[in-house]
Amino acid sequence: GVFVYHCAPGGTMIPFHTISGMNGAIMILPRKGLTDAKGKPWHYDRAYYIGEQDLYLPKDKDGKYKEYAQPLEGMADMLEVSKGLVPSHVVFNGTAGALTGDNALKGKVGEKVLFIHSQANRDSRPHLIGGHADLVWQGGSFADTPTTNYETWFVPGGSASAAGYEFVQPGLYVYLSHNLIEAVLLGAAAHMMIEGEWNNEVMEQTKAPGPISKK
């Protein structure tokens, strides 16, 4: 399965290390590989890790984010902010924009992609705009039969989950946490750029977009 891990040195250092990014995921594949909901082999062409991180950055009296010479200097302030359970940022893979724009994840039409998503602290709701999850291994368990055709799936805090999707059309897809406040305002979003030929049998534009007229 896929599992979350995090630093746990003891006491208040546990949350401090975790909210400082000292966490991730590990994947252990079955000896015979993954199978779909019907028990047939399911092979992926690419696997991408989405490490979701909540950050709690302190601000000064003027509302600007504080800077510290070393991490331990900000420990007390960060822990105080974190007690409110309201993150200043929720990001993928370390920072806002880490997986968007020029840093977008890549793929091709016809490829199957496995997304591994972890969150050490908070619940998350992954969602692929323009697609969905063909298969979801709930709770990250590869020993269980995957569920199928999820629009949005769930990652409980302190766990990792895996989802697979076969891309059938080219274009830009957005993978995000479907708490849209966190996705749009706090940074929990990634881009997936898919190359290939458009398939009109899947979707066809019958009329070019134009102005909306009022009658």
Each predicted region: which residue ranges?
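Copper-binding active sites and cupredoxin-like electron-transfer domains
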Residues: 1-215
